[in-house]
């Protein structure tokens, strides 16, 4: 008789439901992880709304914290019963894309089925959980290429302390890294949701000495100060572009990080940049963008626009855990609510509608 588990699955736009699914069978390079904590991401809400397409019946979620239940025969250096995380991005690090430095765009595992070209590049395909394969909002998840993608959790850290590592922390910090921040730089971070807050923390670690955090929620701006923001601006109370230009003496910021994914925030991120500055884009956009010529100096302003998909792999996760363990960053304040997996539909309703001051929800299957 097939062993079954509970899982949150995409049914159709507007509907994610709890369903019974078979516990995954693993291959020699895989691991089966029993989920102890996972969470809901803004990207999951895009999936819920039908703004990002996935297959019907797919288990959603991409942020796993759990315990190794079973290891494939080729996976070494780990043990059953060990607490681990895996990145939201689980590439095959032998692929062209990974060796080219863009492991998040690795679609090499799709080549045999004809879904990817001969060199294995496919946009966003390195993001497998809840996108290309069944995800983490379930009692169990299959981790592919486990040797390269599992990272042990130190005994002294709780699930909640490392819950941001697989995606939100990795993405936010990548936004700061992509902003080309140098010691003494001034940085504006647009939107202080979970990713923006992590980008604010990452900008501080990268050496920025003046960080301007922008949002329309005063509570989130208070948290931004704890994450390292020196100045907070509520866009409901001021003209953000004017204020940033005043704060910089008309020079503009060295870098801006866009962490929402709207035309308005993208455009503002450009307008506050100094000539030669960098816009680091983290938002997931749902419609075409327009670049205003005046903000972009008609393409002649030496501006740089960098985009990124959350980096993954066990070494990335290890370094993020090191940051948490060092005490330099505490992301515990981002976990504002806890739900059982059985109540996942209610958790989505809360998160998608941004009620009750929600930032991140810890989902507990057991």
UniProtKB/Swiss-Prot annotation:
Its cofactor is Zn(2+). It holds the Pfam family ADH_zinc_N. It catalyses: a primary alcohol + NAD(+) = an aldehyde + NADH + H(+); a secondary alcohol + NAD(+) = a ketone + NADH + H(+); (R,R)-butane-2,3-diol + NAD(+) = (R)-acetoin + NADH + H(+); an aldehyde + NAD(+) + H2O = a carboxylate + NADH + 2 H(+). SUPFAM superfamilies: GroES-like (SSF50129), NAD(P)-binding Rossmann-fold domains (SSF51735). Keywords: Metal-binding, NAD, Oxidoreductase, Zinc. Binds 1 zinc ion per subunit. It comes from the Bacteria. Its EC number is 1.1.1.1, 1.1.1.4, 1.2.1.3. Coiled coil: none annotated. InterPro entries: ADH-like_C (IPR013149), ADH-like_N (IPR013154), ADH_Zn_CS (IPR002328), GroES-like_sf (IPR011032), NAD(P)-bd_dom_sf (IPR036291), PKS_ER (IPR020843). Zn(2+) binds at residues 41, 62-63, 167. One of its GO terms (molecular function) is alcohol dehydrogenase (NAD+) activity. Homotetramer. Multifunctional alcohol dehydrogenase exhibiting NAD(+)-dependent dehydrogenase activities for 2,3-butanediol, ethanol and acetaldehyde, and reductase activities for acetoin (NADH-dependent), and diacetyl and acetaldehyde (independently of whether NADH or NADPH is the reductant). The rate of oxidation of 2,3-butanediol is much higher than for the oxidation of ethanol. Has acetaldehyde dehydrogenase activity leading to acetate formation. May function in the release of excess reducing power in the absence of exogenous hydrogen acceptors such as oxygen. Belongs to the zinc-containing alcohol dehydrogenase family. This is Alcohol dehydrogenase. It comes from Cupriavidus necator. The gene is adh.
């Amino acid at each position: 008789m097939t062993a079954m588990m509970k899982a949150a699955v995409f049914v159709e736009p507007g509907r994610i439901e709890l369903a019974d699914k078979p516990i995954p069978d693993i291959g020699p390079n895989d691991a089966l992880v029993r989920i102890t904590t996972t969470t809901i991401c803004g990207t999951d809400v895009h999936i819920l709304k039908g703004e990002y397409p996935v297959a019907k019946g797919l288990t959603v979620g991409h942020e796993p914290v759990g315990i190794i239940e079973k290891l494939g025969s080729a996976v070494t250096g780990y043990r059953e019963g060990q607490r681990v995380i895996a990145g939201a991005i689980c590439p095959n690090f032998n692929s062209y894309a990974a060796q080219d430095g863009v492991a998040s765009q690795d679609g090499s595992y799709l080549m045999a089925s004809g879904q990817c070209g001969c060199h294995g590049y496919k946009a966003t395909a390195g993001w497998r959980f809840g996108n290309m394969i069944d995800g983490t909002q379930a009692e169990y998840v299959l981790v592919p290429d486990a040797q390269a993608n599992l990272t042990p959790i130190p005994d002294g850290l709780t699930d909640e302390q490392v819950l941001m590592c697989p995606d939100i922390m990795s993405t936010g910090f990548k936004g700061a890294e992509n902003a080309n921040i140098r010691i003494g730089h001034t940085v504006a971070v647009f939107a202080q949701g979970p990713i923006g807050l992590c980008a604010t923390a990452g900008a501080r670690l990268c050496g920025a000495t003046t960080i301007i955090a922008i949002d329309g929620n005063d509570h989130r701006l208070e948290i931004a100060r704890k994450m390292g923001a020196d100045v907070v601006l509520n866009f409901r109370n001021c003209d953000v572009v004017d204020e940033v230009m005043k704060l910089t003496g008309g020079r503009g910021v060295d870098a801006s990080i866009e962490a929402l994914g709207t035309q308005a925030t993208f455009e503002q991120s450009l307008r506050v940049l100094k000539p030669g500055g960098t816009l680091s884009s983290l938002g997931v956009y749902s419609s075409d963008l327009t670049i205003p010529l005046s903000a972009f100096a008609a393409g002649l302003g030496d501006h740089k626009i960098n985009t990124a998909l959350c980096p993954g792999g066990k070494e990335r996760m290890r370094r993020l855990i090191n940051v948490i363990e060092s005490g330099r960053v505490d992301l515990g304040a981002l976990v504002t609510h806890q739900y059982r997996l059985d109540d996942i539909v209610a958790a989505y309703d809360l998160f998608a509608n941004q009620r009750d001051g929600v930032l991140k929800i810890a989902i507990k299957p057991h």
